[in-house]
C-alpha cells in the first residue's frame, strides 16, 4: 500500500470533544504520520492541541495533561462569587489559567521556554502555526500566523482562539479584543488552498443537532448560561457545514460521526457555581473513539492514494502503447551494394 506524506494539519474547534483529537494523535504517532508536519491551522481546542504537537510532547504527556486538568479546581470550577465578572471582566474566568497549566508542563521539558512568538516557534520547532480568532472590535475573523503576526506570542493567540464569550474573558492583543474563532472560522482550511489535499489531514469535530425536547425549566441565569453554550455550538456547526466543507473533498476529512457527548461544553450550573464536567470514563471513551476512527480514516486515505497512483500508472502505460516508434524497423534495410 502506498505511503502517505502528511505535511499539513487542520484542527477544528469542538470544546471538550477535543479529547477525541488525543486518541487520533495516538494513532498518527504509531503510523509515524506526525514527523513531517510543518504547518498546523487550528481553532479553539484545536489550537491547544496544535501546541502539543508543535512542542513534541509525547502522547503519554498529552494524556497526562488532559486527565490532570479535569481535576484541577482552578481550571474547571467557577465559584458563584465570580458571576460579577461577567459585567466587570466580560467573562466568568480567564483562559490564561489553562495556558499557565500548559506552560508549567512545558517548563519541565523545556526549562528555557517562557514565551515564544510565531517566528520563534517556526525557527526552533520547524512548525508554522495558524490560529483562528474572532476580532470583536471589527466583527471579523483574524488568523494569527508567522506571515501576518510573526512577533505575537503563540500562547496569547491560542488563548484568543479558545476564549468562549461569557465563559472566558476576551483577550487583548494590540489594542483590540478577541474571542474564539468559531464565530467566524471554526475550520480554517482555506489557508491551505494551494496545498495538495494528499498532504493534508483535516480533522473536524461535528455532531448533528439533537431533536428539541420541550421542558418546563424555569428561565434564570443558570439556564441562560447553558443555552448560550448550546447556541455557541449551533453557530460553530453551521459555520463549519455551510461555509467550509467541500462535498468533493469529503473523503479527505477526518469527521467522526458517532460522537456520544451531547454538548461541546459539558457544564453543570447551579447555586454553587459553574463546573466543567468531564469524567475519566468520558475521557477514556473519547480517546478510544478517536484512535479507532483515525485508524479507519487512515486506511481509507491509503486506499485513495493507491487507487490514484494505480489510475495514473495505467494512464502512462496506455500512452506508451499508443505511441509510435521513432523509425520503422519492421523490414531489413537494403545492403549498400550487391554482394
Regions picked out by a protein language model, each given a short descriptive name:
Residues 1-43, 51-327, 336-339:
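Patatin-like phospholipase
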Amino acid at each position: 500500500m502506498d505511503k502517505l506524506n502528511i505535511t499539513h494539519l487542520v484542527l477544528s474547534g469542538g470544546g471538550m470533544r477535543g479529547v477525541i483529537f488525543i486518541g487520533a494523535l495516538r494513532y498518527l504517532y504509531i503510523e509515524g504520520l506526525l514527523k513531517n508536519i510543518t504547518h498546523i491551522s487550528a481553532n479553539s481546542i484545536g489550537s491547544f492541541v496544535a501546541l502539543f504537537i508543535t512542542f513534541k510532547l509525547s502522547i503519554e504527556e498529552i494524556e497526562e495533561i488532559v486527565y490532570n486538568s479535569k481535576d484541577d479546581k482552578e481550571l474547571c470550577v467557577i465559584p458563584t462569587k465570580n458571576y460579577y465578572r461577567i459585567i466587570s471582566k466580560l467573562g466568568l474566568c480567564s483562559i490564561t489559567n489553562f495556558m499557565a497549566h500548559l506552560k508549567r508542563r512545558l517548563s519541565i521539558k523545556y526549562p528555557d521556554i517562557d514565551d515564544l512568538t510565531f517566528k520563534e516557534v517556526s525557527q526552533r520547532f520547524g512548525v508554522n502555526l495558524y490560529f483562528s480568532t474572532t476580532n470583536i472590535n471589527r466583527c471579523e475573523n483574524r488568523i494569527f500566523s508567522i506571515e501576518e503576526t510573526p512577533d505575537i506570542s503563540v500562547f496569547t493567540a491560542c488563548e484568543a482562539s479558545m476564549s468562549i464569550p461569557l465563559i472566558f474573558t476576551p483577550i487583548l492583543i494590540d489594542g483590540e479584543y478577541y474571542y474564539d474563532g468559531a464565530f467566524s472560522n471554526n475550520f480554517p482550511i482555506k489557508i491551505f488552498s494551494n496545498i495538495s489535499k494528499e498532504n493534508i489531514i483535516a480533522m473536524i469535530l461535528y455532531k448533528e443537532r439533537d431533536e428539541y425536547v420541550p421542558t418546563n425549566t424555569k428561565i434564570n441565569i443558570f439556564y441562560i448560561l447553558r443555552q448560550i453554550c448550546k447556541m455557541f455550538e449551533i453557530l460553530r456547526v453551521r459555520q463549519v457545514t455551510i461555509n467550509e466543507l467541500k462535498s468533493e473533498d469529503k473523503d479527505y476529512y477526518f469527521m467522526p460521526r458517532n460522537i456520544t457527548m451531547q454538548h461541546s461544553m459539558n457544564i453543570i450550573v447551579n447555586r454553587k457555581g459553574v463546573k466543567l464536567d468531564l469524567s475519566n470514563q468520558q475521557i477514556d471513551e473519547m480517546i478510544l473513539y478517536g484512535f479507532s476512527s483515525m485508524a479507519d480514516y487512515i486506511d481509507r486515505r491509503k486506499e485513495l492514494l493507491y487507487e490514484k497512483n494505480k489510475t495514473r500508472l495505467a494512464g502512462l502505460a496506455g500512452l506508451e502503447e499508443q505511441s509510435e516508434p521513432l523509425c520503422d524497423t519492421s523490414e531489413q534495410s537494403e545492403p549498400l551494394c550487391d554482394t
